[in-house]
Amino acid sequence: MKRAVSGFSSITAALKIASKVGFGNFYRSITSRNTCKTCALGMGGQKGGMTNEVSSFPEICKKSIQTQLTDIQQAIPESFFQDNTIADFKQITPRKLERLGRLNTPLYKKRESNQYIPISWNKALKKIFATLQTTDPERTFFYSSGRSSNEAAFLLQLFVRVYGTNNINNCSYYCHQASGVGLSATIGSGTATVVLEDLRQSDMIWVIGANPSSNHPRLLTELLRCRRRGGKVIIVNPIKEPGLVRFNVPSDWRSMLLGDNEIATDFVQPNIGGDIALFKGIAKVLIESGNIDMAFIEDHTSGYQGYAQDIMETSWTDIIKSSAIDRAQINHLADLYL
């Protein structure tokens, strides 16, 4: 795969968005002191926009630009809701819905109606208040967007606690609850243990079941830097995403002009759901070869003997069939890990 993604096309896309909302609004948005609403690789907070946590500049991505500028679009005219039914909304693509404008007035739908009706804030608050008054707080659950701002999330949880319950969560609950429980049970923390500074000192980075080129493009800068200092980037993904093979980083002139944009040193494509078998295979190679740090395991883990027994009882035939990765490639990955 020779063609790289992003680069000048991303810059062009950002400028198109800027032209719609005004270049003044665009500049104020990308240089403001805030955090990015799209992924955990933040915007530097009080260091200001386009400066990341370790003071690198310029650091920004088109997803961040799209999200921020969506918030400063022109308001959706009230007449739009009068002219369109809910059935009409179902025919509009998500992309067009996002580009309709900014929702700046409460909408109300009567049970028998097929339309949203714009109402005043006073009316909306009275309706909400009337419902809250007749509802037991312990029988309520407040669910918000993981893409809302930190300020909005703080105010919502504060309101919910004043109301009398702690039944609150956001869409990240569905995304990360399973992994959070699993991580808590195994490493003692439900969240990541890696920070940006760690990536900049890593000799090898494994990207497993993730698509940073689509969902958090700024991580690609760190992967590219790892390659340039002689490190390795191992991608484990059933889909061979172009952005994880070659990626033009818009803020990097070598990437943009010289084609220095290779990301993956190894791109491993197991069956969907075959990642467990793949990592069992890597572990089996390590155990069989005796390349295990038993002192570390005894000091910092529990249940190793049961784990090792399960690994050794799993046949190579089952591992290769389930993962769709041959023995030679599994041996190669184990050698890289060592």
Predicted region positions:
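Cofactor-pocket helix-loop regions in the catalytic cores of large enzyme subunits
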Residues: 1-9, 101-338
